[in-house]
Amino acid sequence: MPDYRSKTSTQGRNMAGARALWRATGMKDEDFKKPIIAIANSFTQFVPGHVHLKDLGQLVAREIERAGGVAKEFNTIAVDDGIAMGHDGMLYSLPSREIIADAVEYMVNAHCADAIVCISNCDKITPGMLMAALRLNIPVIFVSGGPMEAGKTKLASHGLDLVDAMVIAADSSASDEKVAEYERSACPTCGSCSGMFTANSMNCLTEALGLALPGNGSTLATHSDREQLFLTAGRTIVELCKRYYGENDASVLPRSIANFKAFENAMMLDIAMGGSTNTILHLLAAAQEAEVDFDLRDIDRLSRKVPQLCKVAPNIQKYHMEDVHRAGGIFSILGSLARGGLLHTDLPTVHSRSMEEAIAKWDITQTDDEAVHTFFKAGPAGIPTQTAFSQSTRWETLDDDRAEGCIRSVEHAYSQEGGLAVLYGNIAQDGCVVKTAGVDDSILVFEGNAKIFESQDSAVRGILADEVKAGDIVIIRYEGPKGGPGMQEMLYPTSYLKSKGLGKACALLTDGRFSGGTSGLSIGHASPEAAAGGAIGLVRDGDKVLIDIPNRSINLLVSDEELAARRVEQDKKGWKPAEVRPRKVTTALKAYALLATSADKGAVRNKAMLDGL
């Protein structure tokens, strides 16, 4: 039987000093025989997705103690990408993922914790904690803060979210009063932004990986039903500890659950629901921590066979996360995939013996369990609040229409090709990614003239100054993990293209990345990035670029000889932006850039540079 890790600091005469300190935290004699379970919280008043988490760690802690464990809570940082966007703050967003992963590792290993409950929610927090959990490989369960309710206003016939406020603000024809109304209405409650953006995508993917409870990704932050997820997580983590430490059952460990097939399941879910392209970055990073050989080629392979079964904002205005929940949540999408013969259903989860068993219990089209049906009727109250579990509104009916509803069957898919695609070509030899769910059919094949910008800032200025015309392909480079550094999100450029009426008339290619709120022909993660000698750094104004999503290709239409000559010239100049960029790159960011790999590797640290240290 494996010993509790915590015995290192709780047992033996020589640990009298450590026990004295443990006692000072409130532990008693009997507690030194129990598992010490770390609660990694991410409460902060900076982020609406985390503003309600302050007391939830202690809610879980009390449940852990009732179930026979010892709970010890700590906090990680959390960056709000929406607030950090559009200025140098965005340089810190992706690097914060590594900081969060390291912080969880530091706290758990320094104090010899036996297991972890990860309370996450927004963009880089769930991925960072996931990386740490797979790195540590001790019992873990994820429970997130939940999605925000969609905004409501009389000025729009559909629900609102953050992107609506950004787009309307850039529309010169919109009155100040309309902009103010959208601003006040777009983000009405606590929780992660209400569309299928990065935060919600990742919280849904933890369900598919088998590391979170059903409903984790879709139950509203404001709804009273979400409290049960936190309480159940507290009980479940103690049970996982008993199975591993008491019964030598290694099948409950995160690397046993989140194996190669589980990563395929998660990616198939992502493709089926048209999730954020950032999820590709984060799944690749998590796979490396799990020592799972899952890469961009696997994602490309899956993207060709998985249909799109769900459309949510920003890909369609009609649906938000509250509508996904009403349609049965993630296990209903997984159920559709399973019935289509696509899903691996023999895998265990933290809550069920197999994914097949979980689908039978939680897919609303497969169960008559009234409690499950009631759970998925949880809906929005439409009352602005920053308080968790503050309302108990329910829909009168479920959306179980798999032909025309929010979630579809394979036979009635929105499209037979999924919502994400990987493109390859001479401009991105190691690949780039596009959220096809947000691309209009008329521009799936697009040839245009390159319009070069050496930074997101200059691109924003150029778009707002009407320098970008219909038929252009906006190239934003030196914004990758090294070149930024930090791989900024490009939500402002894409939002401004929409506001200028160019959403279906232009494309955008970058070695940076996109917010989950991005739609349109927006292609990111070009690898290798410009700062690493990628061909995106060789494109010149006016060059023809051909994008062919059906054939998964993207090519700069110049000869190989010309590209080779340009590379020789660029090697002499150095792979740096042609313009001076007035951004402050601190020591912390320089340290991140030094080890960062390109996006096709998940923008993780280059471990080869650390070998031998």
From Swiss-Prot:
Homodimer. GO terms for molecular function: 2 iron, 2 sulfur cluster binding; dihydroxy-acid dehydratase activity; magnesium ion binding. InterPro entries: Dihydro-acid_dehy_C (IPR042096), DihydroxyA_deHydtase (IPR004404), DiOHA_6PGluconate_deHydtase_CS (IPR020558), ILV_EDD_C (IPR056740), ILV_EDD_N (IPR000581), IlvD/EDD_N (IPR037237). This is Dihydroxy-acid dehydratase. Functions in the biosynthesis of branched-chain amino acids. Catalyzes the dehydration of (2R,3R)-2,3-dihydroxy-3-methylpentanoate (2,3-dihydroxy-3-methylvalerate) into 2-oxo-3-methylpentanoate (2-oxo-3-methylvalerate) and of (2R)-2,3-dihydroxy-3-methylbutanoate (2,3-dihydroxyisovalerate) into 2-oxo-3-methylbutanoate (2-oxoisovalerate), the penultimate precursor to L-isoleucine and L-valine, respectively. It catalyses: (2R)-2,3-dihydroxy-3-methylbutanoate = 3-methyl-2-oxobutanoate + H2O; (2R,3R)-2,3-dihydroxy-3-methylpentanoate = (S)-3-methyl-2-oxopentanoate + H2O. Keywords: 2Fe-2S, Amino-acid biosynthesis, Branched-chain amino acid biosynthesis, Iron, Iron-sulfur, Lyase, Magnesium, Metal-binding. Pathway: Amino-acid biosynthesis; L-isoleucine biosynthesis; L-isoleucine from 2-oxobutanoate: step 3/4; Amino-acid biosynthesis; L-valine biosynthesis; L-valine from pyruvate: step 3/4. Its EC number is 4.2.1.9. Belongs to the IlvD/Edd family. PANTHER family: D-XYLONATE DEHYDRATASE (PTHR43661), D-XYLONATE DEHYDRATASE YAGF-RELATED (PTHR43661:SF3). The lineage of its organism: Bacteria, Pseudomonadati, Pseudomonadota, Gammaproteobacteria, Pseudomonadales. Binds 1 [2Fe-2S] cluster per subunit. This cluster acts as a Lewis acid cofactor. The active site is at S515. [2Fe-2S] cluster binds at C122, C193. GO terms for biological process: isoleucine biosynthetic process; L-valine biosynthetic process. Its cofactor is [2Fe-2S] cluster; Mg(2+). One of its GO terms (cellular component) is cytosol. Mg(2+) binds at D81, D123, K124, E489. Pfam families: ILV_EDD_C, ILVD_EDD_N. The modification N6-carboxylysine is found at K124.
